[in-house]
């Protein structure tokens, strides 16, 4: 890439302060990637009007990184759809995308662009309505959507949650069969995918598919070294929502097994969510309630401190597409034990943690306990894997490194070349 191209970016979620955003994980992805893109391209950003307070004044020509921000909104009467975190949010985004497509078509009649990139709220089954209308190369993603709860582990969910998962899969398959989705995939010059399940769903377009994480980390958040600040005992940490898909019943059963050889082990659960009463009841039945530390959701800096003081990060999520907290644990020199599914399975590689294959719940719980037991028996393993995890976060997940990779993907798209495939982490 020689001259700065002009890029039209759609990032529905895009905000520099995730705590003030409606969708924190998506918002920081949108903000961070757009921030990196402005280093080598002139950007016109289309985003949701909700982000205006956080974005105004952030991209200015005085910084030498020009960006024009265009806000698109829907009528206030439709905002109530956002209260339903499952279907309402996607329905609202579908309508927003149609509105954004009309705006983009009008903008393209008076402005000239070299490339279009759709970043946030991207998944393999929801098509881009903007891309097919623009006569320029299209970069799609990073996208997820292919991940789903492994069949045998669905039994760990309550009945209502199993019904919801079946409805989710049905809805996705209907969308995948639409002409609009096929048009978007055909139009794309590069499709960035954030987990292996989504890559498999897109096998028909594998020549366009590039592994690219949906999570990153700022340089300031990467620990200077990976040496743990141990406080004694054997401390496990989980941070995130207490939601059905997080697999926490497996974590509690693994703790029960682990305590047969490590009776002093503790598991700190940082977060909140609707599953807590069910988890408390399960912990009492399993006899592990006295080994749990329940901590309300904490500021990011406090969670990072806890990561530095823990031995292992336990994250048995059943179908997370990304898993930003896994990257944050790695950046703080904390090895990860997770299932080999979705985003966590994408992030953790040999040497930076231990992944357990999905299967029957009792077998998976035993596998998690066995992985944790390895760290209990060999403190040096925690140090070695912690260093590898921290180094991997710095070399692959730092936002500036992801920006460099994105620049190469743009180069290929603008030159009409297939994207260069790189090693998945």
Task: Specify the residue positions occupied by each region the protein language model found.
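Aromatic "clamp/platform" in nucleotide-sugar-dependent glycosyltransferases that forms part
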Residues: 318
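Short alpha-helical donor nucleotide-sugar binding micro-motif in glycosyltransferases
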Residues: 297-298, 305-310
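N-terminal subdomain of nucleotide-sugar transferases
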Residues: 1-67, 190
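Short hydrophobic beta-strand element within catalytic cores of glycosyltransferases
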Residues: 335-338
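A conserved mid-protein helix/loop that constitutes part of the nucleotide-sugar donor-binding site
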Residues: 28, 234, 241-260, 274-280
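Donor nucleotide-sugar binding/catalytic pocket of nucleotide-sugar-dependent glycosyltransferases
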Residues: 70, 170-225, 231
């Amino acid at each position: 890439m020689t001259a700065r191209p002009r890029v039209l970016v759609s990032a529905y979620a895009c905000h520099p302060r995730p705590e003030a955003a409606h969708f924190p994980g998506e918002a920081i992805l949108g903000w961070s990637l757009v921030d990196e893109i402005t280093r080598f391209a002139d950007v016109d950003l289309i985003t949701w009007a909700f982000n205006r307070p956080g974005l105004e004044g952030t991209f200015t020509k005085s910084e030498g990184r020009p960006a024009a921000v265009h806000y698109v909104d829907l009528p206030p009467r439709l905002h109530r759809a956002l209260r339903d975190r499952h279907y309402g949010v996607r329905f609202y985004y579908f309508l927003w995308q149609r509105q954004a497509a009309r705006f983009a078509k009008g903008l393209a009649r008076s402005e000239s662009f070299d490339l279009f990139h759709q970043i946030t709220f991207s998944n393999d089954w929801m098509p881009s309505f903007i891309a097919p209308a623009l006569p320029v190369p299209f970069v799609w993603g990073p996208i997820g959507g292919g991940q789903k709860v492994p069949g045998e582990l669905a039994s760990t969910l309550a009945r209502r949650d199993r019904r919801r998962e079946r409805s989710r899969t049905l809805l996705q398959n209907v969308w995948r069969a639409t002409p609009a989705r096929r048009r978007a995939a055909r139009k794309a010059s590069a499709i960035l995918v954030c987990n292996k399940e989504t890559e498999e769903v897109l096998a028909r377009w594998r020549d366009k598919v590039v592994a690219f994480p949906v999570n990153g980390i700022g340089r300031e958040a990467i620990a200077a070294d990976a040496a743990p600040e141990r406080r004694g005992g054997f401390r496990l940490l989980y941070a995130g929502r207490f939601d059905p898909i997080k697999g926490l019943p497996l974590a509690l059963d693994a703790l029960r097994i682990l305590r047969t050889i490590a009776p002093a082990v503790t598991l700190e659960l940082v977060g909140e969510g609707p599953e807590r009463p069910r988890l408390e009841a399960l912990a009492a039945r399993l006899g592990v309630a006295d080994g749990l530390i329940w901590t309300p959701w904490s500021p990011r800096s406090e969670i990072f401190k806890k990561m530095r003081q823990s031995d292992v990060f336990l994250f048995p999520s059943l179908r997370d597409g990304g898993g930003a907290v896994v990257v944050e644990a790695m950046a703080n020199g904390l090895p990860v034990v997770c299932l080999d599914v979705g985003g966590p399975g994408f992030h953790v590689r040999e040497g930076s943690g231990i992944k357990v294959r999905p299967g029957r719940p009792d077998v998976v719980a035993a596998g998690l306990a066995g992985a944790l037991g390895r760290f209990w028996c060999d403190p040096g393993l925690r140090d070695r894997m912690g260093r590898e995890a921290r180094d991997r976060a710095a070399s692959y997940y730092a936002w500036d490194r992801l920006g460099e990779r994105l620049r190469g993907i743009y180069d290929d798209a603008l030159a009409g070349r297939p994207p260069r495939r790189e090693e998945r982490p």
